[in-house]
């Protein structure tokens, strides 16, 4: 993947952009203020586009747009990433991966990626809601259901499409209703895998999100394989058990439940030392029903990638139980 310095603000529509847009029929996408904001990510916002022309009922879309406050330097980077995501997403067809709908320009001239509306909230939204309500961890059965659906999506990406997702975490999983559907989203930083499930392209760069990175992505010259997604998958299960972000301890005083987070309490050295390792679990908070979840989390977060299961093995192990 090219470095940021190699990108320049385009003065006119690039040939790559033209080729992607030409394959998309003309679609009237409203300006951002006229759509409900669903969420946001690095450099982008996601909106809900309701489609019911002339009284007809159409399924809504989720529309991803570049954040308007981005400066020109970063805008070109995010535009390329959005175009890459559109190209990849258009080739994917799986019930556990958010579907492609269109790639076009909105009425305000901004680039838009229209996707299947996978659900009202991300898994991260549900985790935060549960944490703020001081609720218990998600039931083991729900965690295993999420695990199976995510693993099916990853199996498809790894085996059939030879793609590493590259940024698995709770905020990149969308949920509809009461876990009626579970879909992986945000394939904008995906990387090609070779026949050995390894990222060998010298131009490819693993992006990920820091707390979910495996050891091989933290270390210099680490070899990235499909097992990088598996490590992050394991930490996503950990999120559902702990209602926390990996390696972020908001309070060092377990006896003071009302203690609020103070940046001065954050231990940078301990945080960076913990990256790529398996975070601890308070076993006293989890009953015996979580045994299979804990076992799956543990094997997926082994530091040596060779000791982690493939997505296909996870699917095989879970399909008989969920």
Swiss-Prot record:
There is a cross-link at residue 169 (Glycyl lysine isopeptide (Lys-Gly) (interchain with G-Cter in SUMO2)). Signal peptide: none annotated. GO terms for biological process: cellular response to UV; mitotic cell cycle; negative regulation of inflammatory response; negative regulation of proteasomal ubiquitin-dependent protein catabolic process; negative regulation of stress-activated MAPK cascade; proteasome-mediated ubiquitin-dependent protein catabolic process; stress-activated MAPK cascade. Phosphorylates MAP kinase p38. Seems to be active only in mitosis. May also play a role in the activation of lymphoid cells. When phosphorylated, forms a complex with TP53, leading to TP53 destabilization and attenuation of G2/M checkpoint during doxorubicin-induced DNA damage. Interacts with DLG1 and TP53. InterPro entries: Kinase-like_dom_sf, PKc_TOPK, Prot_kinase_dom, Ser/Thr_kinase_AS. Residues 32-322 form the Protein kinase domain. Belongs to the protein kinase superfamily. STE Ser/Thr protein kinase family. MAP kinase kinase subfamily. GO terms for cellular component: nucleus. Pfam families: Pkinase. The active site is at residue 167. The modification Phosphoserine is found at residues 32, 59. Residues 320-322 are annotated as: PDZ-interaction. This is Lymphokine-activated killer T-cell-originated protein kinase. Phosphorylated; in a cell-cycle dependent manner at mitosis. It comes from the Eukaryota. Its EC number is 2.7.12.2.
